[in-house]
């Protein structure tokens, strides 16, 4: 069989076309040192800041220090078996976590892996933990409320959808309790919740999850956990992972609420990583970029306009705005709000709820100090009825505090001052609320109306709590439709005012408290 030159060249071309070589270009490096969860790698020339580096044993590290002759990376997970000379590879990917509705009702770790024993996650894809916050043009002003269910917060320090409201106070002052009750109160509001637990005991987190389940709020919540026993890297990254999960709902025209419990521990974890990476320390040994650590996280909580949502969903969702509301928690030492991290976060957020240990120990719970607690944008989001009825509460408390301090030195007080002191004491008593007992807008409005219009004047101070409970039970039993109407509309007019007067007059006549 003879082949001419044309056939030979055709056969060679066919063979070349059929020849299939799979080649992957890996930027490979060598570990030169391992200590305290930090590895130094030589040879990763093309690595990006924040890139995942693949380690032996299906583990990853994140590149944080890019130096001339080596890369400093923090290991996510156990590192005891890593040694000098081991080979590592670039992945070309930034850290991503699973996102989607399938995560609701689940407990996951920083990397999005389930840790609740309920099987694999049903997710809608992955999202990078680090994302650029929406720009100025893509945002919309805050004008819808997030009801926490607490009278003192919803009346005096209202929170709006898309707001960042700091919860700050010493340890054991009820910060987590306030945040958990805010989640429980969203059961029927349509707001999806994310609870990020940073550096807490596993037993504490277990109690929180159980309480959410008992009150029917877990099915609406994603719990992201980085316990105290986990590495500093996972504690530092947990808030960003939770934020990415919350942004999934915001970008699709829905409302979400995220709790960071707490950012003080995240800052400590980041300080540990930075010092081990030999970055220069600053005030209180924190690195220079600790402000940026929190600002880039909290700026992602926002209210985005309908154009942003439509562009993101490629026209699938039209005419809907989305929001991510953040409630970061900061723990202070002996009430010192002028420390480095507290002042940073106060300057980033749109207001703060300050909880005081003195008030907490005096039995005033939630222990909100109305003097230095403020909401800078929430007032625009308050419902009409709450705005109308809550105006006098803050003033009454401020006057009461001033007079109470003055009255300690005065032996005889005139009737007007006595009356004001009595009113202030009763309002303070009225704002007390038990844990896991959030109140609806209508219930809060009725109670505030009673305080505002002087219905508590002839009620003994010790009977204020039982008066409130009996009033709400009576209103719910006899005027349930009116309360439902107020919850749905939030409106306030002469007709509702007249009905409230009628309810209180009839109830006071019964003397059943």
From Swiss-Prot:
**InterPro entries linked to this entry:** ATP_synth_asu-like_sf, ATP_synth_asu_C, ATP_synth_asu_C_sf, ATP_synth_F1_a_nt-bd_dom, ATP_synth_F1_asu, ATPase_a/bsu_AS, ATPase_F1/V1/A1_a/bsu_N, ATPase_F1/V1/A1_a/bsu_N_sf
- Chemical reaction(s) catalysed: ATP + H2O + 4 H(+)(in) = ADP + phosphate + 5 H(+)(out)
The keyword Transmembrane appears for this protein:
no
A Pfam family annotated for this chain is ATP-synt_ab
Going by the UniProt record, its keywords in alphabetical order are: ATP synthesis, ATP-binding, Cell inner membrane, Cell membrane, CF(1), Hydrogen ion transport, Ion transport, Membrane, Nucleotide-binding, Translocase, Transport
| Gene Ontology CC terms | plasma membrane; proton-transporting ATP synthase complex
SUPFAM superfamilies referenced in this protein's UniProt entry, alphabetically: C-terminal domain of alpha and beta subunits of F1 ATP synthase (SSF47917), N-terminal domain of alpha and beta subunits of F1 ATP synthase (SSF50615), P-loop containing nucleoside triphosphate hydrolases (SSF52540)
In terms of superkingdom, the source organism counts as Bacteria
Residues under site feature: Required for activity: 373
Q: Which residues bind ATP?
A: 169-176
Q: List localization entries.
A: Cell inner membrane
State which Enzyme Commission number(s) the record gives. Answer: 7.1.2.2
Q: Which PROSITE patterns match?
A: ATPASE_ALPHA_BETA
Topology of the protein relative to the lipid bilayer: Peripheral membrane protein
Positions the record marks as coiled coil are: none
What the record says about family reads: Belongs to the ATPase alpha/beta chains family.
Q: Which PANTHER family match?
A: ATP SYNTHASE SUBUNIT ALPHA, MITOCHONDRIAL
Quote the subunit structure annotation. Answer: F-type ATPases have 2 components, CF(1) - the catalytic core - and CF(0) - the membrane proton channel. CF(1) has five subunits: alpha(3), beta(3), gamma(1), delta(1), epsilon(1). CF(0) has three main subunits: a(1), b(2) and c(9-12). The alpha and beta chains form an alternating ring which encloses part of the gamma chain. CF(1) is attached to CF(0) by a central stalk formed by the gamma and epsilon chains, while a peripheral stalk is formed by the delta and b chains.
Per its UniProt record, what HAMAP family does this chain match? ATP_synth_alpha_bact
Function, as annotated, reads:
Produces ATP from ADP in the presence of a proton gradient across the membrane. The alpha chain is a regulatory subunit.
- Protein name listed in UniProt: ATP synthase subunit alpha
């Amino acid at each position: 069989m003879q082949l001419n030159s044309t056939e030979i060249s055709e056969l060679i071309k066919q063979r070349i076309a059929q020849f299939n070589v799979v080649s992957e270009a890996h930027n490979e490096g060598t570990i030169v040192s391992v200590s305290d969860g930090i590895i130094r790698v030589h040879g990763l020339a093309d690595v990006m800041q924040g890139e995942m580096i693949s380690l032996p044993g299906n583990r990853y590290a994140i590149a944080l220090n890019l130096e001339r002759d080596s890369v400093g990376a923090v290991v996510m997970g156990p590192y005891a078996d890593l040694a000098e000379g081991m080979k590592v590879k670039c992945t070309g990917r930034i850290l991503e976590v699973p996102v989607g509705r399938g995560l609701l009702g689940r407990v996951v770790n920083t990397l999005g892996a389930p840790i609740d024993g309920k099987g694999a996650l049903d997710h809608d894809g992955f999202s990078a933990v680090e994302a650029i916050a929406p720009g100025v043009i893509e945002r919309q002003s805050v004008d819808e409320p997030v009801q926490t269910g607490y009278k003192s917060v919803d009346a005096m320090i209202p929170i709006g959808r898309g707001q960042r409201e700091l919860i700050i106070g010493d340890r054991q002052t009820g910060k987590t309790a306030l945040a958990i009750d805010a989640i429980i109160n969203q059961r029927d509001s349509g707001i999806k919740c994310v609870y990020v637990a940073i550096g807490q005991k596993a037993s504490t987190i277990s109690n929180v999850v159980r309480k959410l389940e008992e009150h029917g709020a877990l099915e609406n919540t994603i719990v992201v956990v980085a316990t105290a026993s986990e590495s500093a890297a996972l504690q530092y990254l947990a808030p960003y992972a939770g934020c990415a999960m919350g942004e999934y709902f915001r970008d699709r025209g829905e409302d979400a609420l995220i709790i960071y419990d707490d950012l003080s521990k995240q800052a400590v974890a980041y300080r540990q990583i930075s010092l081990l990476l030999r970055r220069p320390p600053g005030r209180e040994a924190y690195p220079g970029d600790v402000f940026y650590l929190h600002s880039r996280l909290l700026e992602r909580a926002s209210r985005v306009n309908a154009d942003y949502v439509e562009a993101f969903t490629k026209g699938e969702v039209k005419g809907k705005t989305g929001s991510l509301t953040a409630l970061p928690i900061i723990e202070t030492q002996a009430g010192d709000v002028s420390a480095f991290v507290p002042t940073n976060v106060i300057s980033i957020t749109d207001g703060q709820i300050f909880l005081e240990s003195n008030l907490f120990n005096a039995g005033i719970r939630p222990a909100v100090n109305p003097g230095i607690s403020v909401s800078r944008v929430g007032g625009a989001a308050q419902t009409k009825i709450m705005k109308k009825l809550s105006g006098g509460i803050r003033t009454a408390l401020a006057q009461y505090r001033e007079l109470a301090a003055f009255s300690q030195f005065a032996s005889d007080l005139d009737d007007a001052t006595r009356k004001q002191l009595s009113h202030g004491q009763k309002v303070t008593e009225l704002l007390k609320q038990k844990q896991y007992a959030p109140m609806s807008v209508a219930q809060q409005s009725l109670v505030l109306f009673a305080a505002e219009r002087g219905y508590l004047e002839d009620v003994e101070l010790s009977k204020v709590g039982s008066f409130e409970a009996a009033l709400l039970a009576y209103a719910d039993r006899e005027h349930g439709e009116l309360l439902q109407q107020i919850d749905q509309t939030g409106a306030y007019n002469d007709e509702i005012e007249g009905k409230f007067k009628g309810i209180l007059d009839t109830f006071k006549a019964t003397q059943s408290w």
